[in-house]
Amino acid sequence: MQIILLDKVANLGSLGDQVNVKPGYARNYLVPQGKAVPATKKNIEFFEARRAELEANLANVLATAEARAEKINALGSVTIASKAGDEGKLFGSVGTRDIADAVTAAGVEVSKSEVRLPNGVLRTIGEHEVNFQVHSDVFAKLNVNIVAEA
């Protein structure tokens, strides 16, 4: 299925690219999320007429994401208290939702889908470096300090 991208999509392309994707991916994800439209003659003409407006909107979103990434980097570190055993292992784990809630409580709005844990959930006490993907092009890093609850 031919589509026109309205936003940058990982592994596909950027604004204005006409790409061929599987129909289910287009129907169930790209079109409902507002990231693409089917490449009909009407949509191609409509896109070309609004191209400057869409590019300005995309630049605005990117600037907002960069500002949020700077705020995350400025935090330095966030402390999360969790129940732990004697050897420093947690009862359970600290996942993306816990980290997103802690960062949001510290003053920077972050959703759990923006938190990247390459080695899986955190299961030990101590300092852990966590990556955030605020936008497809914008990344931030933050130290998460996990301490045992008293």
Swiss-Prot record:
It holds the Pfam family Ribosomal_L9_C. One of its GO terms (cellular component) is ribonucleoprotein complex. Gene3D superfamilies: Ribosomal protein L9, C-terminal domain, Ribosomal protein L9, N-terminal domain. GO terms for molecular function: rRNA binding; structural constituent of ribosome. The keyword Ribosomal protein applies. Keywords: Ribonucleoprotein, Ribosomal protein, RNA-binding, rRNA-binding. One of its GO terms (biological process) is translation. InterPro entries: Ribosomal_bL9, Ribosomal_bL9/RNase_H1_N, Ribosomal_bL9_bac/chp, Ribosomal_bL9_C, Ribosomal_bL9_C_sf, Ribosomal_bL9_N, Ribosomal_bL9_N_sf. NCBIfam families: L9. Belongs to the bacterial ribosomal protein bL9 family. Binds to the 23S rRNA. This is Large ribosomal subunit protein bL9. It comes from Photorhabdus laumondii subsp. laumondii (strain DSM 15139 / CIP 105565 / TT01). The lineage of its organism: Bacteria, Pseudomonadati, Pseudomonadota, Gammaproteobacteria, Enterobacterales. The gene is rplI.
